[in-house]
Amino acid sequence: MKKEILEWIISIAVAFVILFIVGKFIVTPYTIKGESMDPTLKDGERVAVNIVGYKTGGLEKGNVVVFHANKNDDYVKRVIGVPGDKVEYKNDTLYVNGKKQDEPYLNYNLKHKQGDYITGTFQVKDLPNANPKSNVIPKGKYLVLGDNREVSKDSRAFGLIDEDQIVGKVSFRFWPFSEFKHNFNPENTKN
């Protein structure tokens, strides 16, 4: 009987160590701050950020990521353009490599916009710190925008982000539990 109890205690201890390692080195929690991703992610909601998997699988357009905006702040935004993409917005319409792209995650904000446009018109070369002679996103850089474009501070304000600024990809929202969601890619976004 004592041996069985000891085995249970060891099993539970090992499970806690594994959970700690997974929590510390593979997935980390993040609390949404602000309204820049509303209604996809709202202020105060909690998400799990995969800090390893995106490095092996790569980032794709439409992924939602957390990144270091500066020494003190992390932001959460959607990847709009990846290295090698030619990105352009014309009157709220996204074109990547010359092809019009759907952005279903903007439906709510387009219906409730305050002005004429929520994204406007710009090209990669118009962004801060960009090469004024090229509309192509360079290697190691990403264009990120918030889903709530009218209030979001994103690549339009600070330019392309470096790959090494990225903390990880949002895997799922776990709080509030009633709003649990595990995939934020465009084809799975309805609002």
Swiss-Prot record:
The keyword Nucleotide-binding does not apply. Its main location: membrane. PROSITE patterns: SPASE_I_1, SPASE_I_2, SPASE_I_3. The chain crosses the membrane at residues 8-28. Keywords: Cell membrane, Hydrolase, Membrane, Protease, Transmembrane, Transmembrane helix. The active site is at 36, 77. It comes from the Bacteria. Its EC number is 3.4.21.89. It is an enzyme of class 3 (hydrolase). The keyword Transmembrane applies. GO terms for cellular component: plasma membrane. InterPro entries: LexA/Signal_pep-like_sf (IPR036286), Pept_S26A_signal_pept_1 (IPR000223), Pept_S26A_signal_pept_1_CS (IPR019758), Pept_S26A_signal_pept_1_Lys-AS (IPR019757), Pept_S26A_signal_pept_1_Ser-AS (IPR019756), Peptidase_S26 (IPR019533). GO terms for molecular function: serine-type endopeptidase activity. It catalyses: Cleavage of hydrophobic, N-terminal signal or leader sequences from secreted and periplasmic proteins. GO terms for biological process: signal peptide processing. It is found in: Cell membrane. It is a single-pass type II membrane protein. Residues 1-7 are cytoplasmic. Residues 29-191 are extracellular. Belongs to the peptidase S26 family. Essential for cell viability. PANTHER family: CHLOROPLAST PROCESSING PEPTIDASE (PTHR43390:SF1), SIGNAL PEPTIDASE I (PTHR43390). This is Signal peptidase IB. It comes from Staphylococcus aureus (strain COL).
